[in-house]
Amino acid sequence: MSAITWRPGQPKQEWGPRAWHWLHLMAINYPPDPSENDMARARVRIGRFIQSLPCADCRIHAAAYIAAVPPDASDAQSLQVWAWRFHNAVNRRLGKRQFPFAAYRQLYLSEMCWAEWSSACP
């Protein structure tokens, strides 16, 4: 999965869905039985992803979240649950709707969500 690049001054409404799309598809594509190297790489990728966010407040909030609730990269299901909880925590803080886990999996496993940067994904 390639890195995301942001345009300077790009509004959150544009880059936010792309960021979530990247994070969730990374979790969905994660191996069911990862090696120690896979686990370390996933945590590094998530850390770099957080550091790359174009919004300073978002980087601060995301870094605080992963410091309190580190990514669980022990297996695919755990990483998916972590990404889902992280997204719901951000939505809760922003006063947005929460997604049930079943709806999350159905959405991010659907073909229409697999198109790069699909508008079908939140």
Regions from the language model: what does each represent?
Residues 1-122:
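Terminal, compositionally biased segments used for targeting/anchoring and flexible tails
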